[in-house]
Regions:
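Sensory-domain boundary/capping and coupling elements
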Residues: 1-6, 127-142
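Short linear interaction motifs
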Residues: 1-4, 72, 85, 98-101
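PAS-family sensory domain signal
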Residues: 7-59, 108
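Acidic/polar residues at beta-strand termini and the immediately following turn/coil
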Residues: 22-23, 110, 122, 139
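PAS/Per-ARNT-Sim sensory domains
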Residues: 48-76
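PAS/PAS-like sensory domains
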Residues: 74-89
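PAS-family sensory domains
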Residues: 89-97
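Short loop/turn elements at sensory-signaling interfaces that couple input to output
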Residues: 99-127
């Protein structure tokens, strides 16, 4: 069991910034797993909308703010999750003085649809690799 826990922790540290969930009955966000190396983390417990009202204007890239304010609203998330099982929001977040690309994967915890689960990953390296690959393809075509 100890080895399994160590493997799980190493995967979390490498792959995600945090895992949190929102109880749709009371609108409270609860953070259950965090990567100590990640910046801009949600509180352990707090009002979901109030957290967004503070963090989005402060940390989200100006060009992504309006989209994040709209797409992260609980009503909007529930609308989008009626159409598909998972919803992903990609945006830029100010971390340590520079903007990093983040991907938030959101889904329902179970069939009761009373709890939303949020998993945030840093995808900056993947994004930059893809941009470089696209540039190389473009340059090769010229």
């Amino acid at each position: 069991m100890e080895k399994q826990r160590a493997i799980l922790e190493s995967v979390i540290k490498e792959e995600i910034d945090f895992i949190s969930y929102v109880d749709l009955e009371d609108g409270m966000v609860h953070t259950i797993v965090t990567n100590e190396d990640a910046d801009v983390m949600p509180p352990i417990d707090g009002d979901y909308q109030k957290v967004n009202d503070v963090t989005i204007p402060k940390y989200v890239h100006p060009e992504d703010r309006e989209m994040c304010e709209r797409e992260f609203r609980l009503e909007r998330l529930q609308e989008n999750l009626q159409k598909k099982e998972r919803f992903v929001i990609n945006y830029r977040l100010l971390c340590g003085g520079e903007y990093r690309r983040k991907s938030m994967n959101i889904h329902y915890y179970d069939k009761t649809k009373m709890t939303l689960v949020f998993v945030r990953r840093d995808v900056t390296d993947n994004y930059e690799e893809e941009q470089n690959r696209q540039r190389e393809i473009y340059d090769a075509m010229l």
